[in-house]
Amino acid sequence: MSDTIEFDSKAFLKDLTNQPGVYRMYNHKQDVIYVGKAKNLKNRVSSYFRSQVDSIKTQSLVKQIAHMDVTVVHSEAEAFILENNFIKKYKPRYNVLLRDDKSYPFIFLSDHQHPRLANHRGPKKRKGEYFGPYPSAWAVRESLRTMQRIFPIRQCEDSYYRARSRPCLQYQLQRCAGPCVEGLVSDEDYQAQVDLARMFLKGKNKQVIDSLVQHMERASTDLRFEAAARYRDQISALNKVQEQQWVSGNQEEMDVFGFAYRNGIASIQGLFIRDNKLLGSKSFYPKVPAEATDEEVFQSFILQFYLAGNKVIPKQIVTPLELNEQGAIEELLTKEAGRRIQFYRGARDEKRRYLDLANTNAENALIAKQGQQKSVFARYTELEKILEFEQPIQRMECFDISHTSGQLTVASCVVFNREGPFKADYRRFNIEGITPGDDYAAMAQALARRYRDVKDDSKIPDILFIDGGKGQLTQAEDYFEDWKHEKKPLLIGVAKGSSRKAGLETLILAGNHATIPLSGDSIALHLIQHIRDESHRFAITGHRARRQKDKKTSKLESIPGVGAKRRQSLLKYMGGLQGILQASRSEIANVPGISAELADTIYDHIHN
């Protein structure tokens, strides 16, 4: 007999207010399983407990409710915002969840005598102009590379710029005009290039080309043939870029979303147009509860997408579906953006062209996602069969260790769920206080740091893979011997064969250390190889980053009279270790807090 008390909906509804607000539903474990908002709380919550409820999702949800609570707000707009905040906080299983709600990157043009172009993500605190948002950091990097080939504008940090006494490699490659060194470019000529770059970022390519043609003709008339050739090369490079861009005619600022949804998988494709230019696209796969409708999935996505931090809301949003509460959402986003925001569904002409493209991409992405999931599902099923699992494997983790001759050791922990890599739960550990090269001690420390504070059973893996042989596996066995949780992972060591070739791994079970026979073409082995390779990659990239950071500071750490603050000041002012190595004694003495005498000491130390 169950010792849980059934939720008394009648008693709860009796005193429920008719005001707008947000409601939260909890199960018997006190987990929030659903968050909703309502213009009228009493009417909305009552609808869940009617005798005739057609939705299978709602029926399943209601059966699990142990208790509810509500938060009353002043308006429907406040309810939208609070609902979104609660969904981000609790990640309820019956809500549609946007997995990627981070801010998007911009191209930043600084407010400086000689402005720089840079990648920017986060709050817009620095003075300057921001262009975007771009769909990914890759899109920003590609745009900056393209601009560097066309406009010789610096992309270096201000500290590096200040420390220069001679031009860097970018000047030699003709990718920077060298404003850091007096006499290489006049302020007027540099500003002219900045103005052209600004027009380019605003999508005014024709005006840029017209201006460059005028400059080229003027330079040719004045017999400045070298300058004329540079303008000619700029025009040629710009024409090549323009051939590759799909330029919008009159859509200065617009987001367009395509949508496809089948068998519990939703694919949403966003196209982002700014300043008459398609900046790029991005695929989204929100986590969708069973039996969710198209409208529910898409509206939840739109709200979570635009209410996430540091999002720029465009004037026009083109959607494939009518939103259930479109008027209220338009009003909310208008208030958030501080200007009028409009949704378009019955799109025509250019908007229709973009919408068709977005829908086609969403459909193609959905087909690819379904194929990927079928492949992953088959691999999991095969592994469950081999290991005789009675329940589906929901979570697997794998550990690996990376170091160089025992120094700067880094341990990695990667996580896979039924959909493949779950990168939000990846972790790295910088290993300290062990004998250099002692991989067993490194593994023991990593395991202890990863699992000592685990409270949620869902964060405990069903299978824990250890990249290594019996010695590494023994460390995991020792750690879990006194494990206090009811759920305990199955421990498996993944030992490389003598040739270290894929397909020749030995899988070792904890306890009796029996090996698991798997053929090289086994799809279950392919899944294990995937998680092992991912843990290896994650460990190596972490170790390389740590090694690179150590290189930057190790040469400075042994200099007499140079502590942590002065090291940071040197690195910041000189733009990194290379800047310090190339600096003269007098340039080092210009760093705040560094005397001429100390500058001599620093110079002698790093050059001897």
From Swiss-Prot:
One of its GO terms (biological process) is SOS response. It comes from the Bacteria. Interacts with UvrB in an incision complex. This is UvrABC system protein C. It comes from Pseudoalteromonas atlantica (strain T6c / ATCC BAA-1087). CDD domains: GIY-YIG_UvrC_Cho. GO terms for cellular component: cytoplasm; excinuclease repair complex. The UvrABC repair system catalyzes the recognition and processing of DNA lesions. UvrC both incises the 5' and 3' sides of the lesion. The N-terminal half is responsible for the 3' incision and the C-terminal half is responsible for the 5' incision. InterPro entries: GIY-YIG_endonuc (IPR000305), GIY-YIG_endonuc_sf (IPR035901), GIY-YIG_UvrC_Cho (IPR047296), Hlx-hairpin-Hlx_DNA-bd_motif (IPR003583), RuvA_2-like (IPR010994), UVR_dom (IPR001943), UVR_dom_sf (IPR036876), UvrABC_protein_C (IPR050066). GO terms for molecular function: DNA binding; excinuclease ABC activity. Transmembrane segments: none annotated. Belongs to the UvrC family. Disulfide bonds: none annotated. PROSITE patterns: GIY_YIG, UVR, UVRC. Keywords: Cytoplasm, DNA damage, DNA excision, DNA repair, Excision nuclease, SOS response. Residues 18-96 form the GIY-YIG domain. The gene is uvrC. Its main location: cytoplasm. It is found in: Cytoplasm. The keyword DNA damage applies. Pfam families: GIY-YIG, HHH_5, UVR, UvrC_RNaseH, UvrC_RNaseH_dom. The keyword NADP does not apply. Residues 206-241 form the UVR domain.
